[in-house]
UniProtKB/Swiss-Prot annotation:
Region spans: N-acetyltransferase: 248-455
Region (Pyrophosphorylase) location: 1-226
UniProt-listed GO biological process terms: cell morphogenesis; cell wall organization; lipid A biosynthetic process; peptidoglycan biosynthetic process; regulation of cell shape; UDP-N-acetylglucosamine biosynthetic process
Assembly information from the UniProt record: Homotrimer.
Gene Ontology CC, one term: cytoplasm
Function field: Catalyzes the last two sequential reactions in the de novo biosynthetic pathway for UDP-N-acetylglucosamine (UDP-GlcNAc). The C-terminal domain catalyzes the transfer of acetyl group from acetyl coenzyme A to glucosamine-1-phosphate (GlcN-1-P) to produce N-acetylglucosamine-1-phosphate (GlcNAc-1-P), which is converted into UDP-GlcNAc by the transfer of uridine 5-monophosphate (from uridine 5-triphosphate), a reaction catalyzed by the N-terminal domain.
Annotated protein name in UniProt: Bifunctional protein GlmU
Keyword Transcription: no
Protein residues bound to acetyl-CoA: A377, N383, Y384, S402, A420, R437
Length: 455
């Protein structure tokens, strides 16, 4: 069975009180529409058609991809009208309708719904709620068969008492869709063309309406304002936390933990409070992450330790290495096994060999540091001349004294030592000691300046 997916994303979202189109508001670091597209792709459809309207150019710009077909809805005349705009592009056997502001929908739920769809059967996703205010109500006959959906504003008191609501997510036989779209009417309280009216048409045409429900009602929760957006955010984070804990991660407090990307984890991982994981993060077995850390697009090998208040982006920490507290690893930073980065150390495009140590108060940029090398406190690689970047290379077993300035391009060869306070501008040969500082001069009888007395 071939599949086309239509995602409705044309709404303005006036209750957001924002210049940003509603579907671009983020949940867990990705736009709501981005989450829906991600789920849609996992169903491997032959086409994904995104119906856009308000802020159309910005939506195109943010989400442009070869596998997306953007369809313009110039006037927002209802969900039925929106789907009708995509009709000319639909060629598959089945059409699945999704919503760009319903980001938590699970792929497994959609797969169950699609299994209900066929030439003679329409799949409808419903949800049972204690308070279904705002939802269209599912009307069933005495045999329990769905006969219609009545929108909340059009429902009478008896219909409003129904707890089963319409999510709007449908799996439809494409061969019948054009006919149903042509028969839609806007004779209702909203003056809009409701997609839900196809349910009654399908029943009249002899089709069965088969329903499915999500395991969690929050899967089908939309966001019309920022309060609802925050509820989606927190639910997503708790769901991701449960997923990671099921895979062997200890979260000190799942309510104080955020995932904003794709996270792969091993077993016996410990994550403390207020940790944010962004982008693609790989965490292997026995890793420990202290409180208040931000880790983005980074790989943490087995047994690595990230201490409190550290910020890592585009980095790789090797097996048994450690960083922090208050460490910053910028893109291109690589720590080999058992390398150590201490407090208030910043690395950028720097490679630390196995067992290398950078204890504290140091900046290393565009640097290659050999195994077992020790970098003293206050060391800085001077890698930028105002126009170009240059590299600093240190061999194995180098000892850099405290408060050194290493003016790149420069090489300090294996086993060399630099004295504290040195400014190194030339190659230091293997095993040599480099002393590059002014000789101390003491001035006897010197008197400190005195403050001028005010008249």
């Amino acid at each position: 069975m071939s599949l086309d997916i239509v995602i409705l994303a044309a709404g303005q979202g006036t209750r957001m009180r924002s210049a940003l189109p509603k579907v671009l508001h983020p949940v867990a670091g990705n736009s709501m529409l981005g989450h829906v597209i991600h789920s849609a792709r996992q169903l491997q459809p032959q086409g994904i058609h995104v119906v856009i309207g308000h802020g159309a150019e910005l939506v195109r710009e943010r989400l442009a991809a070869d596998d997306l077909n953007f369809v313009m809805q110039d006037k927002q005349l209802g969900t039925g009208h929106a789907v009708a705009q995509a009709l000319p592009a639909l060629t598959a056997d089945t059409v699945l309708v999704l919503y760009g502001d319903v980001p938590l929908i699970e792929v497994e739920t959609l797969q169950r719904l699609l299994a209900k769809a066929s030439d003679q059967q329409l799949g409808l996703l419903t949800v049972t709620l204690e308070d279904p205010t705002g939802y269209g109500r599912i009307v069933r006959d005495e045999q329990g068969q769905v006969t219609a959906i009545v929108e909340h504003k059009d429902a009478n008191d008896a219909q409003k008492a129904i707890k089963e609501g319409n999510t709007g997510i449908l799996a439809l036989p494409a061969a019948r869709l054009a006919d149903w779209m042509g028969r839609l009417s806007n004779n209702n309280a909203q003056g809009e063309y409701y997609l839900t009216d196809v349910i009654a048409m399908a029943v009249a045409d002899g089709l069965v309406v088969a329903t499915e429900q999500p395991h969690d009602p929050m899967e089908v929760q939309g966001a019309n304002d920022r309060r609802q957006l925050s509820e989606l955010e927190r639910h997503y984070q708790l769901r991701e936390g449960r997923r990671l804990m099921a895979q062997g991660v200890t979260l000190r407090d799942p309510a104080r933990f955020d995932v904003r990307g794709e996270v792969t984890v091993g077993r016996d991982v410990l994550i403390d409070i207020n940790v944010i994981l962004e982008g693609k993060v790989v965490i292997e077995d026995d890793v420990q992450i202290g409180p208040n850390c931000v880790i983005k697009n980074t790989t943490l090998r087995k047994g690595a330790v990230v201490k409190a208040n550290s910020h890592l982006e585009g980095a790789v920490m090797g097996e048994g290495s450690d960083a922090g507290p208050f460490a910053r690893l910028r893109p291109g930073s690589v720590l080999d096994a058992k390398a150590h980065v201490g407090n208030f150390v910043e690395l950028k495009n720097a490679h630390l060999g196995e067992g290398a140590k950078v204890g504290h108060l140091t900046y290393l940029g565009d640097a290659e540091i050999g195994a077992r090398t020790n970098i003293g406190a206050g060391t800085i690689t001077c890698n930028y001349d105002g126009a170009n970047k240059f590299k600093t290379v240190m061999g194995e077993d180098v000892f850099i004294g405290s408060n050194n300035s290493l003016v790149a391009p420069v090489e300090i060869k294996a086993g060399a030592t630099t004295a504290a306070g040195s400014t190194i501008t030339q190659t230091v040969e293997a095993g040599d000691l480099a002393v590059a500082r002014a000789r101390q001069r003491n001035i006897s009888g010197w008197k400190r300046p005195e403050k001028t007395k005010k008249s």
